[in-house]
A protein has these predicted regions:
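Ribosome-associated RNA-binding proteins
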Residues: 1-164
Length: 164
């Protein structure tokens, strides 16, 4: 038996565990332990204006497992999660309120569908959006810094050599 266990706090953390075992209780217990060990943070963002708290994914993300591709697309506030039941539950556990999803491949394979959704959700935290970029301070080159001095006409300085 191969149970799939999802765990989340509905506020920015989600985990997924899959365990295979001959006994049902052992498999379920192992899947729960693996789900707890694989908890990842989920960064949420805005769609449109930045009013209120973050409610959707920051930008489009894709996850793949087996033949299944899952794409998470930001949605306006109040849309809800427009998805099949498997990704919908994972996204709810992650604390995402509004999201469109697109799935391709053999989505009837429940394990691959859940793993592809989890892969897309983990990709969210790995991607740095524009608001998280560190401010870059550029230093001027010496030619730019002293351009006014270098542009002035200077008298050529000759070297006097004495004859011996």
């Amino acid at each position: 038996m191969t149970p799939i266990s999802a765990i989340g706090d509905y506020n920015g953390h989600v985990g997924l565990g899959v365990k295979c075992s001959k006994e049902v209780a052992t498999a379920i217990r192992g899947a729960i332990i693996l789900a707890k060990l694989s908890i990842v943070p989920v960064r949420r963002g805005f769609w449109g204006n930045k009013i209120g708290r973050p409610h959707t994914v920051p930008c489009k993300f894709t996850g793949k497992c087996g033949s299944v591709w899952v794409r998470l697309i930001p949605a306006p506030r109040g849309t809800g999660i427009v998805s099949a039941p498997v990704p919908k539950k994972l996204l709810q556990m992650a604390g995402i309120d509004d999201c469109y999803t697109s799935a391709r491949g053999s989505t009837g394979t429940l394990g691959n569908f859940a793993k592809a959704t989890y892969a897309a959700v983990t990709a969210i935290y790995a991607y740095l959006t524009l608001d998280l970029w560190k401010e870059t301070i550029f230093q001027k080159s010496p030619y730019q810094e002293f351009t006014d001095y270098l542009s002035k006409n200077h008298k050529p300085v000759g070297v006097c050599r004495s004859r011996r």
